[in-house]
């Protein structure tokens, strides 16, 4: 009898040891089968938990229990929350080891233009017209963020924006459809690589779908009046480019679109995004946007708001907690089909598998600090900052001569470390190189470089005046009705010029500004945006001629706020040129695509592959570009199209391609 019992016990242990793991845990199984297997095992409550993204708070005493119950699908980590990598992995361990099914939590953070190493604001990145360099910056940002446990960034923003009063114009690529599409796709590739599950990669969440940048009067959250034609021609193409680049997530916007809020809009979220484009990632609402459907006036209460959002195609809600608290009852009462919940959960799980969270849930680097602010990161930040800056005026004062006797550096931004913009990731101002430090490091040994406060006289060979708007004058809901330089800075520039100085104005801005009162008093005018960690070095590289400026404007700079909205690609009218004001014409102070350098380029031999093309046929264009100056430099070749006899009115000019090339003096290249 004892022998029999021991044999049975041994057989039991053998069977237990060889029990088959659930299919969803098998990393070799097809992704779709893993998703279906896991979904079939989930309760309704667990499904709704996957659709919930609350805000991480270090003082939240209920979070561990919520994760254990499977009620947290993702956590949004706000700037300043200081989620340490060890704490992130502790929370993930609860999800993986203590929840019933072991579904990992996805951690999201705003990595907008860098994590610890900060690159120029996105509008500045677009001014580089160098998508390859933008992709490199996103790759570095992903590496830093991933090392600290971040799985997904709420970036890129690809909202076409044509009103500089809108504070969030700083976060996108400006007024042009193609620039937003090209740079958005480049950032997606940089964040995700060819496999977003690899070490050092993070998922991209493209935002804000759709029309957010067309807010009435440049006032954040305002409604938009956009026809389906306007959506398809202007506002949707950048999102399509990002979806085609493989973005795993899309964020729905705050605004309404011609009466239907974007976060309850079945046309855009379901018909276009999913059915037409084949998007199979998940849609995330913007912060509290599901709850705010009540404020829009289309939902009587939170339960109705949740049903409308999920039905339209919002898979996961950020912070509002309505899915978890109301949708169980809505499903039981047949006000929401259970199949729609499954659709949303399937999308979320698909992304978690794609990001490798099930197979590698603990992503933090064992020594994350080693991955931050590396020499490569700082080199890339310096190059991108320099290429993003746009020289708008130069009356022969730049580049600065090494033989100058004296340089006065002045203005609020001369020693400021407020150089990161509104979204700063985990950037530390102490890492930033100031303009003062950058200029001092590159000035000639015999040049007296001084701050204005250190000089009894304001007279010098050259005055470098650092002006601009701080990071809290742009960004989300930081809209301006007056877009001139604030704080009396125009007066400072004028006074320095009237005292006989050569005046070089460096502007640190997050939007196009009205600089009409500055231009007459500036011998040189450089737009620096908010350039990031290597700001001062990049400015000095350009001022002293270590590099030639190569940035071009991604937005039009107006002569007056009264011209807004203003953009280059407006449609032709029956009376072209007559759309003016009593006091001024309709032309910008500085147009889209404009930017000077320290050399000259000559264009020649424009060639087309064919002079006549049938509908659907492609036409190739080539042109030869020659550096006719004396300095190695980069030039952006821009190709525009005008359809002179179309079925509908078309833009007078439309950017259809561009190439940035570097040429030595006398060198030619065909592009």
Each model region followed by its residue ranges:
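Glycoside hydrolase catalytic-domain context in secreted enzymes
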Residues: 12-671
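Sec-dependent N-terminal signal peptides
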Residues: 4-12
């Amino acid at each position: 009898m004892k022998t029999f019992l021991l044999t049975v016990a041994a057989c039991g242990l053998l069977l237990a040891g060889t029990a088959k793991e659930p299919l969803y845990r098998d990393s070799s199984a097809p992704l779709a089968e893993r998703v279906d297997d896991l979904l079939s095992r989930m309760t309704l409550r667990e499904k709704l938990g996957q659709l919930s993204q609350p805000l991480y708070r270090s003082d939240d005493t209920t979070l561990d229990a919520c994760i254990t119950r499977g009620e947290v699908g993702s956590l949004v980590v706000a700037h300043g929350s200081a989620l340490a990598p060890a704490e992130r992995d502790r929370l993930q361990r609860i999800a993986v080891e203590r929840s019933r099914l072991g579904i990992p939590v996805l951690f999201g953070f705003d990595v907008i233009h860098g994590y610890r190493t900060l690159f120029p604001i996105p509008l500045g990145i677009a001014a580089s017209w160098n998508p390859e360099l933008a992709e490199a910056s996103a790759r570095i940002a992903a590496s830093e963020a991933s090392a600290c446990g971040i799985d997904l960034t709420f970036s890129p923003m690809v909202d076409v924006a044509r009103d500089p009063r809108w504070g969030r114009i700083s976060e996108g690529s400006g007024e042009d459809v193609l620039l937003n599409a090209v740079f958005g796709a480049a950032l997606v590739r940089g964040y995700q690589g060819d496999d977003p599950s690899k070490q050092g990669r993070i998922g991209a969440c493209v935002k804000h779908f759709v029309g957010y940048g067309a807010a009435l009067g440049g006032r954040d959250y305002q409604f938009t009046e956009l026809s389906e034609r306007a959506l398809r021609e202007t506002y949707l193409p950048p999102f399509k480019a990002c979806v085609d680049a493989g973005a795993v997530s899309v964020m729905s916007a705050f605004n309404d679109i011609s009466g239907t809020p974007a976060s309850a809009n079945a046309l855009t979220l379901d018909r276009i995004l999913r059915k037409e484009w084949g998007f199979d990632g998940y849609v995330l609402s913007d912060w509290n946007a599901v709850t705010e459907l009540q404020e829009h006036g289309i939902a009587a209460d939170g339960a109705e708001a949740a049903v409308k959002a999920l039905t339209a195609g919002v898979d996961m809600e950020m912070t509002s907690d309505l899915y978890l608290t109301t949708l169980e009852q809505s499903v039981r009462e047949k006000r929401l089909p259970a199949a729609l919940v499954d659709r949303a959960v399937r999308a979320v799980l698909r992304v978690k598998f794609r990001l490798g969270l099930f197979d590698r849930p603990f992503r933090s680097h064992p020594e994350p600090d080693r991955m931050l602010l590396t020499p490569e990161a700082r080199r890339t930040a310096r190059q991108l900052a320099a290429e993003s800056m746009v020289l708008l005026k130069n009356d022969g004062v730049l580049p600065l001569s090494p033989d100058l006797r004296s340089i006065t550096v002045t203005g609020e931004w001369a020693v400021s470390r407020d150089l990161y913009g509104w979204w700063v990731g985990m950037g530390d101002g102490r890492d930033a190189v100031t303009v003062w430090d950058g200029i001092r490091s590159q000035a000639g040994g015999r040049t007296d470089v001084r701050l204005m406060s250190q000089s009894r006289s304001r007279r010098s060979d050259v005055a470098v005046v650092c002006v601009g708007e701080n990071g809290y004058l742009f960004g989300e809901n930081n809209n301006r009705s007056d877009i001139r330089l604030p704080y009396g800075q125009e007066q400072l520039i004028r006074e320095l010029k009237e005292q006989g100085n050569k005046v070089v104005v460096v502007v640190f801005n997050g939007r196009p500004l009205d600089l009409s009162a500055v231009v007459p008093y500036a011998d040189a005018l450089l737009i620096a945006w908010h350039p990031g960690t290597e700001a001062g070095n990049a400015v000095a590289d350009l001022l002293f001629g270590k590099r030639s400026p190569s940035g071009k404007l991604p937005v039009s700079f107006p002569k007056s706020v009264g011209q807004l909205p203003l953009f280059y690609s407006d449609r032709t009218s029956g009376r072209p040129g007559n759309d003016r004001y009593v006091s001024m014409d309709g032309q910008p102070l500085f147009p889209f695509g404009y930017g000077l350098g320290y050399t000259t380029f000559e264009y020649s031999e424009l060639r087309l592959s064919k002079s006549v093309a049938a509908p659907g046929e492609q036409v190739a264009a080539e042109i030869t570009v020659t550096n006719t100056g004396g300095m190695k430099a980069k030039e952006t070749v821009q190709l525009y199209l005008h359809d002179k006899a179309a079925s509908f009115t078309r833009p007078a000019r439309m950017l259809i391609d561009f190439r940035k090339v570097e040429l030595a003096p006398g060198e030619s290249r065909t592009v």
